[in-house]
Amino acid sequence: MSDPKFIHLRIHSDFSMVDGLSKVPPLVKKVAAMGMPAMALTDFTNLCGLVKFYSTAHNCGVKPIIGADFTLQSEEFGDELTKLTLLAKNNVGYKNLTLLISKAYLRGHVQHQPVIDKAWLVEHAEGLIVLSGGKSGEVGRALLKGNQQQVERCIEFYQTHFADHFYLELIRTGRADEESYLHFALDVAEQYDLPVVATNEVVFITEESFEAHEIRVAIHDGYTLEDPRRPKNYSPKQYLRSEAEMCELFADIPEALANSVEIAKRCNVTVRLGEYFLPNFPTGGMAIEDFLVMKSREGLEERLEFLFPDPEVRAKRRPEYDERLQVELDVINQMGFPGYFLIVMEFIQWSKDNDIPVGPGRGSGAGSLVAYALKITDLDPLEYDLLFERFLNPERVSMPDFDVDFCMDKRDQVIDHVAEMYGRDAVSQIITFGTMAAKAVIRDVGRVLGHPFGFVDRISKLVPPDPGMTLEKAFIAEPALQELYDADEEVKELIDKCRILEGCTRNAGKHAGGVVISPTAITDFAPIYCDAEGNFPVTQFDKNDVETAGLVKFDFLGLRTLTIIDWALGLVNPRLKKAGKPPVRIEAIPLDDARSFRNLQDAKTTAVFQLESRGMKELIKRLQPDCFEDIIALVALFRPGPLQSGMVDNFIDRKHGREAISYPDEKWQHESLKEILEPTYGIILYQEQVMQIAQVLSGYTLGGADMLRRAMGKKKPEEMAKQRAVFQEGAEKNGVDGELAMKIFDLVEKFAGYGFNKSHSAAYALVSYQTLWLKTHYPAEFMAAVMTADMDNTEKVVGLVDECKNMGLTVLPPDINSGLYRFNVDDNGAIVYGIGAIKGVGEGPIEAILEARNKGGYFKDLFDFCARIDLKKVNKRVIEKLILAGALDRLGPHRAAMMASVDDAVRAASQHHQAEAFGQADMFGVLTDAPEEVEQKYTQVPEWPEKVRLEGERETLGLYLTGHPVDEYLKELTKYTSCRLNEAAPTRRDQSLTVAGLVIAARVMTTKRGTRIGLMTLDDRSGRMEVMLYSEALDRYAEWLEKDKILVVSGQVSFDDFNGGLKMSAREVMDLGSAREKFARGLSISILQSQIDQQFFERFSHILEPHRAGTVPVNVYYQRPDARARLTLGTEWRVTPSDTLLDELKQLLGHDQVELEFN
């Protein structure tokens, strides 16, 4: 290959996030395909793509040049920011580049972008080559302004600090001022003997990608393409030009080309990838391996005393634990990971010592006895046949990876502790990148192209909302999208542009749980990224790249369920302490509690971790789990693979004796597999069983068996052929028939695809069981904790309040005197609604209220409440929300009176606060001790009707708490219905049942065949029922399919096999008005003689008038002390008896004097 004539030294990938269109690997591969031996990646103030760039470049035979584009601020230019590019000449330069990037984010945000200070440039100059930034750099700006003195000062700075490492950059991409700058620059270069270099400031691969890049920039900047104000900073010529094109472009300045090659030769950085660097763990001078052994043995002793309190039993069981511990310790120490285990041990122990709940384990880590001994996990791996080699395989070197669950509320405290222990500059969270996803990219590109919202919305709604959805998958999943694409040229154009942009890096954020702990400063391994305020620093390498770069990742995950358990125990244990009883230790509860398993078998698992979905409840009812092993199996079985393969049916039938148990198949089984498969009734359910079968039958080591399990998962034909031979040979050596061995191998291979990690299943089954146990033994406290965790999700709270009622628990409205921010439990065992769940109140006002209550005791009334709180924090709107929610019910006569008195109470309180602030002088100038108490006088107004009161609760709480909209109609509904919902029973096909209730959920769904079905849930306070409306019924009654309506529905009732309970197929649907017209014989109105005055009949006819032309006769009963007469109004006065009519008549005459008459 001949010597290169040009090398690209300024290329952006999509990691530049503002500009740059291409992913790093395709970019590098294109450079290699063009025959270029080197390239520089210079993303804007970041090295996010470095690991991918360095690895891909080496694999493609391209020399990677590491650099970045920067924005620079200096006294010379004041508020005007300039550009420059820095390339790492050597490893010192690479470190300085990393430090400059980190400083720009941590300390240098100006005008919403990371910026470096010129003084930092001097401090970190060693090993860096500077490209001047072309017309946007300091020299370029000064030249274009014609400021010769500024030009001289700038050149003097770079010649002083960068000597022969500063190049004037020349760019020819057809943008404004480029040629003017270029001529000036060449003159200056000659005058000051400065080298020049040609670049193309590449932001996309091909010229055709220009429009897509313009769209990307417009999305970021918030413009449409046609907006005349849109800045046009880019050119179609900023593509990856070939060497020949660049040579032709700069044929008149050959030294600019030659210098690009010269710079490429000067840049030689070696990045160490694929090694691991752990921080030093303090061991008090002991060898770290010995320290791990000591801690593990001490911990195992404690565990054995807990597991086997009887010394004789303990002595008998000890050898197998000691042997397993030694095997694991040998592997951990040989592989060089003792520090990893000790680091995890320390922060978990610190968490437990500081009352921060920690999960019992997660993933394959629960298979380690060392982890159990060090209290990293809380499940005995020998008891449940969990394998260490599934976690750490001595035959496949990779870092161990403990995922640790912490209470959501306190997880950040643990990260803060780790930063304190190892040094804040050595601990960081990890970056994660948001990309342009299928649905969002359609909306963004559509907006930028100026399409109407409706047009774009129609297309984006055809993309399913599933996680990981791509345009390619969407075309397969939704045929209508393909039809639209083929039929409409505008749609095709939009989608084609979206395809180019889909998957582009859009923004950076913080990974959910990843934390790295470095042996030295993080910046020795990766640059830092953070927000515009310099907060939340994260590594610029993502979770995979940061490990490749040598840093060890620890996953600090937040698990909401641990928070719920913690809150529940926070309610339970103080009460137990008060009663002189020992506290509940959740890690010590028995795993065979009969009451808990009875609730489980009845599928009373709403709010129980992992076991609360409809499908899971159905599986529980079929399986009837009666031991902890069955809960482990439940977690593993409830996945698409086992459910679709028939494995679940076999498992259930074998458990209940409907199918013979074989190990694993009645035709092909072996006695040695019985012990492995007995807990799962002969079904190969877990990955660990796959490994054990290979070990027992064919003599695999467990490390080798783990490799087999992985190979089976990947299904590579050559690898599988190799493994089959090894399996058969090993089996025959063990005296197993070769044909039988191959049949078992086939069965193992089949089920390996569905196999689940038992360690993870067991650890999470333990959390499931703990929540089940709490729900069983401390139901009020548990449900209060669950509702607190979900208080921001009104829909969920509504369902949980219903579950409380099903459990026989009382849920009281929020109460300003006995309530807390969270849901809590009063002395009578009733759940008090959390004040924090009231919509529109917020944490600040509640804190202020609780502070006033703690300081001065319970509030006496509304006036006392307003006088004692800080009205700047708790304003009138908040007080009104509290009244509507019922939180002030104990402070006044009724909600209507308090709402009418709010203004007076706030005014009086303001005067009271002013008097407090200035002091009160009496007429003789003597200061009194305190202002007078606020006078309490409620505005006299009638109490709200129940409907208004309940609507206030629904507005603020999201549900009806002190009543139900159905209540006032219960007597009337008996005239239309066959029974209440809780009395309904299945009917024959030719029979109908009529029920009524409030619609609490309604939707229309489309089946896979394209059929539309209406679904609604009726609630009459006695129970609920799912109602289906098929084809004709849906067409006829679609308008009634609306939430919060009271409907009367007739149809066939049957068992709901999927959800349990009953369901109805609707034949007729009526709202209350229609039902009244159909069933009511008349509207009875009683008028007393004393009620009649001169205006009475005018008011009476005024109320009836809007409701005439109905079908129900009006029967007026006139009553005086000595006689009663009935008068039926003429047919022209027949009415439609709506709620409005009935309410207005009741207000005029009285509640008991208006009612519907039925046969």
Swiss-Prot record:
GO terms for biological process: DNA replication. Its main location: cytoplasm. Signal peptide: none annotated. CDD domains: DnaE_OBF, PHP_PolIIIA_DnaE1. Keywords: Cytoplasm, DNA replication, DNA-directed DNA polymerase, Nucleotidyltransferase, Transferase. This is DNA polymerase III subunit alpha. Belongs to the DNA polymerase type-C family. DnaE subfamily. GO terms for molecular function: 3'-5' exonuclease activity; DNA-directed DNA polymerase activity; nucleic acid binding. NCBIfam families: polc, PRK05673.1.
